[in-house]
Amino acid sequence: MPHYQEVDDASGDGGPMAATGPSREAVKKMDQIIQNFHTKAAIIVLGARVGLPVVFTKEGTKKVNKWFQIETDDTDAYRDELHTWRMCGGFQNRPPPLIIETYLDTSHLTSSQRLVIVDDLGKRWDALDALSNSCGSNDGRSEVILERWKIELRDIPGEQPYDFGSTLPTIYKKCIVFFRSLYSTAKLVPAWKFKKSLGKNGSPTNSLIINCRITTGDTQPRRIDGLKQPILDHSGPVTSTYVLGATDTPAGQIFAEVTYRNDCNFRVDDSESILSSRFMGADEHFFTPSLAAKGDLSRRRSTKQTEIGSLPAHKHLTDDSGPVQTYGSLSTFHGNAPPRGSSPMSALRAQRPIGSDTSSPPVGSLPYSRPSLTSKGSLKSFEGMALARRTSLSFQPFKAGSLSSSPSRATYAGETLPASPGSLPRASGISALAQARNRSSLTAGMPATLRGGPVTSDNVVPTSVSSSPKPAPIARYSSSFTHRRSRPSYGGASKLVDDDQGSSGKQSVSSSVQPGSGILAEAGAGGSSGSLQTDDDNISDFLKLLDSKKTLQSFEPSGEASKKRATAQLSKFQSMRDSHNALTDSMASSSMLQRSSSSSSRQLSSVPPMVAATSISAASSPGKPISPHTPHTPAIPSRLSANSIAEYDQPRRVTRRSRTTEARLEDVQDNDHSNDAGTNAIDIPTSPRPYYPHARRSSSVAQQHRALAIDDDLGDLPFGVHRSISLGADDREPPSLSTLLNIGQASDDVESPTGQSPSLLQPAPRISEGSTAMSRQTSSSLEAHDSEVPQLSRFSGPGSANSPYRPRIGKTGGRGVTPPQTGSFSSLLVDRGSASGSERAGGGRYSFSRGIGAYEADDEPLLFDMSEIGRDISRRSIDEPRGGYEASRGGDSGSSSRRGSRWGR
């Protein structure tokens, strides 16, 4: 509680009131509350508007007023003005209303300065002149009242006063609430904001000063209130009044309110600028054209009354609706502009045609076209978008544009814009160039593997650059999996070459269009770069695509479920990327193998012996179409080929170097069993092998061991065995069966019965069971073609050079023990050329009696011909006896020469 002053008991005021009413001490405390209420309110308002001097104590500290729990610096300013309220009381000497006016003092303005106020529209008004005109007096006003505060102690009620001593603490607490409200309100009204703006901007000449004055309600009120006089010429209220509240006391109700001017945006301007602005505003209407004067007379009059004395009257009321960009700029849009920052897709979608198009295409211009066999809705959207778009040759500087890369102020999809004339000659159908240029990150295009093979569309007419019909519009967006190299296409379609797949992030036309759209149906037509026809055609189709009202899945407002679904789909396609790459590479290599092996042929049993026209691919079964999804198909012998049966009972690993003699001689013995049931098997001579089961050397192609049931290829031809399919087999044509039989019959005639080496007549250490089927098939196929000819397999021994089943003897030492070679190399070459055909015939290469057909389609020599020839000679020379070696070599050379001459015939 504040410190109340002591009441003088000798004062004669208290007589009857003391006997029947409140005590003298309670009355004194009530008077102190009313006095400090007025003075404290005045100090708060004055301190917020003007600077007040501070009173210091004897100790040198500031004297602080702590009434109503708000600390304010005590001041001697306005002490005389506030003397009345310092000496007032609640019941006797009642105070008059306290009025505090805050005004703007303009007495320091020079003759060249004017106090102006700026309205919300930016117009300047001369404040002092407006106030003088409204008051009707010519006295030079030098102030503008900003606000007025009023604090009043109203009359006490008519009942007899009661003892209120016990209610004083409650009254004091109510006053605390009021002063908190007053302190806040004093810093929220416009006058305080204007005072703060003056302090920030500064006034070097002190031309504008805010002052306050204190008046009482007893003064004669003015005939015209300066606070309520309008300065701005508008119909809005000039002032506003805010009631802070009323505090009930035993002495009466304390009422407080504030009335303030709504517009306080005052400033000082040069008087000449105000005068010239006033003249310019008046001249603006004097020079209006006469034709427009009649129609706009009423509007001009009202505007003139509003903006007298200032230039920028209606400039802010009009909206700038001119074109955003001028002719000749990139991607021009005309008419009402779309909102700034909107995407180019929204701007294009907002285009609409105007009433008619007066332009016509020139004679030499490129033709435009309409889509063929389109629906009614798509044709309607095509015509509307084609007329609205003014095409240009503007290429985007970047390879892929984003969805918000073009600033524009367009309306949205529901609204439309007028189009510019001259857009008809350039509106055309689809092409692939501009779509690849205009595609965003969502329309980048899939690689050929994900798109699938091109399918011929029913509503597409492939055209060249000079033809009129164009393909139908694209039905959907491409996927965004891009930056991948081109793959060859299958299914009978032409190959689409992606010429710019290697560039950084840019995808070519062929990889960004859809398979069935027919955009690339005429690849290479009008192949000049920068073709105007392709540019204009595809721009029109791009507009059609935007007009199809299809919402991308990424922009569908379907909530969290659609986002998860889209994320799952994108993740699935991203995980399929590597597998599709591998599949495409495999398909590409398979197609190359199909072309390389398509010329390798095989004689069927039903075809005449000398005719080799029927060919069967080595990479697929007979009658099976070549499929792009079966790369590297192994050549499995077909059961249709002469009833051949593959045996897989006892596979063994053999190599080109470890071919044994017994594999060929077993065929001879098995043929004896199949043809002569009563004939016993003869001993097959072979050389002893200390390292009989040789492991196959790793192949240069597969780098792995390959298990074969038997070895029946090509006899002693060391370089014609185990051909890989990937090396190709289309450079040689196999001999016919008749040729092979003639060679075999001639070899029987010239064969010497004593030519066998006795050292070779040793029993074979092992005879494979799988050779039985092979020899039986060989003999049966030979007898079917020529029954008169003796069996090719019935030879006296493998030592003869003429025998097609001549064993490869030297298989003991491997590669490291080959001795030096002797003998005639030319005879070996003749032997090679003459014996190759018969060995193929006897070995069952072309008799369709193979057990395993892993190498049956390869006839061209390997890359290691000469090394294999030398290796075969060295292997034979190891096992042959020293004495009979030269004789047998001579016999071999002679017989080989004779066989070579017979073969040449």
Curated annotation (Swiss-Prot):
Keyword entries, A-Z: Autophagy, Cytoplasm, Protein transport, Transport
Annotated segments matching region Disordered:
1-22, 295-377, 398-425, 444-535, 554-704, 747-850, 871-905
- Cell division keyword on record: no
Q: Which residues form the signal peptide?
A: none
Cellular component GO terms, alphabetically? Answer: Atg1/ULK1 kinase complex; autophagosome; cytosol; phagophore assembly site
> Which InterPro entries would you find in this protein's record?
ATG13 (IPR040182), Atg13_N (IPR018731), HORMA_dom_sf (IPR036570)
What subcellular locations does the record give? Cytoplasm; Preautophagosomal structure
Q: Which residues form a coiled coil?
A: none
UniProt GO BP: mitophagy; piecemeal microautophagy of the nucleus; protein localization to phagophore assembly site; protein transport
Q: Where is the composition biased (Polar residues)?
A: 323-334, 769-782
Q: Name one Pfam family in it.
A: ATG13
User: Its Gene Ontology molecular function terms?
Assistant: protein kinase regulator activity
Biased composition regions of type Low complexity, renumbered to the chain: 454-469, 502-523, 586-606, 888-898
| Biased composition regions of type Basic and acidic residues, renumbered to the chain | 659-675, 871-883
Q: How does it assemble?
A: Interacts with atg1 to form the atg1-atg13 kinase complex.
- Family per record: Belongs to the ATG13 family. Fungi subfamily.
- Stated role: Activates the atg1 kinase in a nutritional condition dependent manner through the TOR pathway, leading to autophagy. Also involved in cytoplasm to vacuole transport (Cvt) and more specifically in Cvt vesicle formation. Seems to play a role in the switching machinery regulating the conversion between the Cvt pathway and autophagy. Finally, atg13 is also required for glycogen storage during stationary phase.
Q: What is this protein called?
A: Autophagy-related protein 13
Q: Which organism is it from?
A: Sclerotinia sclerotiorum (strain ATCC 18683 / 1980 / Ss-1) (White mold)
